[in-house]
């Protein structure tokens, strides 16, 4: 019985396969990048923040509203104890909150109070206050579809910045801090719109 010689793919076939794989990779990267950019878009940019009045997580008998926060900028950070990315970004958020550049308000979303309190006890509480929206109804007005999500609201109640996803130190330094500086230096000027990349 004679063995037929093994045939190896021709260089032309290998080049074609590699070309197709590279094309698929480029298309995937482009689609993912455009989806990421679209996911950060917020119809609220440059507009008044939605009204809210929600109970405090630590004392549900007390409520806090957007009018209580008016007059100075604040960062509204949407999180949940069930959110793995929220736990990952917690040290970055804590470090930023310690700088006291802006009030950091926690927005506990679609969570059980007991779980949220335990999470803050274990990972630390960087927030000046934490509001609770266990049903997620108020978050609809903000366009929240995932946690973590972060909004920067200026002293006039205008949404100046929005980011869906975990914050990192580079984003804080290169995106958030320049917008805060802009707000601090021109609190009555017309707001510039900023979107996370």
Curated annotation (Swiss-Prot):
<dbReference type="InterPro" id="IPR017937">
    <property type="entry name" value="Thioredoxin_CS"/>
</dbReference>
<keyword id="KW-0201">Cytochrome c-type biogenesis</keyword>
<keyword id="KW-1133">Transmembrane helix</keyword>
<comment type="similarity">
    <text>Belongs to the thioredoxin family. DsbE subfamily.</text>
</comment>
<comment type="function">
    <text>Involved in disulfide bond formation. Catalyzes a late, reductive step in the assembly of periplasmic c-type cytochromes, probably the reduction of disulfide bonds of the apocytochrome c to allow covalent linkage with the heme. Possible subunit of a heme lyase.</text>
</comment>
<dbReference type="GO" id="GO:0015036">
    <property type="term" value="F:disulfide oxidoreductase activity"/>
</dbReference>
<dbReference type="GO" id="GO:0030288">
    <property type="term" value="C:outer membrane-bounded periplasmic space"/>
</dbReference>
<keyword id="KW-0472">Membrane</keyword>
<dbReference type="InterPro" id="IPR013766">
    <property type="entry name" value="Thioredoxin_domain"/>
</dbReference>
<feature type="disulfide bond" description="Redox-active">
    <location>
        <begin position="83"/>
        <end position="86"/>
    </location>
</feature>
<keyword id="KW-1015">Disulfide bond</keyword>
<dbReference type="GO" id="GO:0017004">
    <property type="term" value="P:cytochrome complex assembly"/>
</dbReference>
<keyword id="KW-0997">Cell inner membrane</keyword>
<dbReference type="InterPro" id="IPR013740">
    <property type="entry name" value="Redoxin"/>
</dbReference>
<keyword id="KW-0812">Transmembrane</keyword>
<dbReference type="InterPro" id="IPR050553">
    <property type="entry name" value="Thioredoxin_ResA/DsbE_sf"/>
</dbReference>
<dbReference type="GO" id="GO:0005886">
    <property type="term" value="C:plasma membrane"/>
</dbReference>
<feature type="topological domain" description="Cytoplasmic">
    <location>
        <begin position="1"/>
        <end position="11"/>
    </location>
</feature>
<dbReference type="InterPro" id="IPR036249">
    <property type="entry name" value="Thioredoxin-like_sf"/>
</dbReference>
<protein>
    <recommendedName>
        <fullName>Thiol:disulfide interchange protein DsbE</fullName>
    </recommendedName>
</protein>
<dbReference type="Pfam" id="PF08534">
    <property type="entry name" value="Redoxin"/>
</dbReference>
<feature type="domain" description="Thioredoxin">
    <location>
        <begin position="43"/>
        <end position="181"/>
    </location>
</feature>
<dbReference type="InterPro" id="IPR004799">
    <property type="entry name" value="Periplasmic_diS_OxRdtase_DsbE"/>
</dbReference>
<keyword id="KW-0676">Redox-active center</keyword>
<feature type="topological domain" description="Periplasmic">
    <location>
        <begin position="33"/>
        <end position="197"/>
    </location>
</feature>
<feature type="transmembrane region" description="Helical">
    <location>
        <begin position="12"/>
        <end position="32"/>
    </location>
</feature>
<keyword id="KW-1003">Cell membrane</keyword>
């Amino acid at each position: 019985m004679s063995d037929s010689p093994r045939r190896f793919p021709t260089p032309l076939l290998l080049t074609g396969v590699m070309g197709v794989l590279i094309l698929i990779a480029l298309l995937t990267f482009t689609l993912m990048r455009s989806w990421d950019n679209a996911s950060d878009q917020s119809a609220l940019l440059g507009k008044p923040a939605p009204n809210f009045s929600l109970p405090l997580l630590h004392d549900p008998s007390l409520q806090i509203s957007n009018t209580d926060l008016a007059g100075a900028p604040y960062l509204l950070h949407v999180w949940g104890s069930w959110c793995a990315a929220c736990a990952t970004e917690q040290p970055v958020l804590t470090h930023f909150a310690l700088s006291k550049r802006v009030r950091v308000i926690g927005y506990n979303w679609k969570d059980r109070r007991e779980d949220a309190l335990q999470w803050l006890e274990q990972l630390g509480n960087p927030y000046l206050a934490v509001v609770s929206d266990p049903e997620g109804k108020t978050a609809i007005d903000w366009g929240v579809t995932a946690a973590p999500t972060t909004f920067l609201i200026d002293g006039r109640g205008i949404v100046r910045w929005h980011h869906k996803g975990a914050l990192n130190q580079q984003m804080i330094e290169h995106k958030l801090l320049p917008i805060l500086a802009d707000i601090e230096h021109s609190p009555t000027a017309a707001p510039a719109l900023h979107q996370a990349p």
